[in-house]
Amino acid sequence: ADNKFENSLRREIACGQCRDKVKCDPYFYHCG
């Protein structure tokens, strides 16, 4: 559960920081 929460948080942060999805890491590409 902790890992899932951490991954979700990291994904939200990465999506917030990413301006160009082409430059996003594949793991963070599908966010929402």
From Swiss-Prot:
Signal peptide: none annotated. Contains 2 disulfide bonds. Expressed by the venom gland. The keyword Disulfide bond applies. Its main location: secreted. GO terms for cellular component: extracellular region. One of its GO terms (molecular function) is sodium channel regulator activity. The keyword Disulfide bond applies. Keywords: Disulfide bond, Ion channel impairing toxin, Neurotoxin, Secreted, Toxin, Voltage-gated sodium channel impairing toxin. Disulfide bonds join C15-C31, C18-C24. It is found in: Secreted. Belongs to the scoloptoxin-03 family. Toxin that specifically inhibits tetrodotoxin-sensitive voltage-gated sodium channels (Nav) (IC(50) of =about 9 nM). In vivo, insects injected with this toxin showed signs of neurotoxicity including twitching, paralysis, and body contraction. This is Mu-scoloptoxin(03)-Ssm3a. The lineage of its organism: Eukaryota, Metazoa, Ecdysozoa, Arthropoda, Myriapoda.
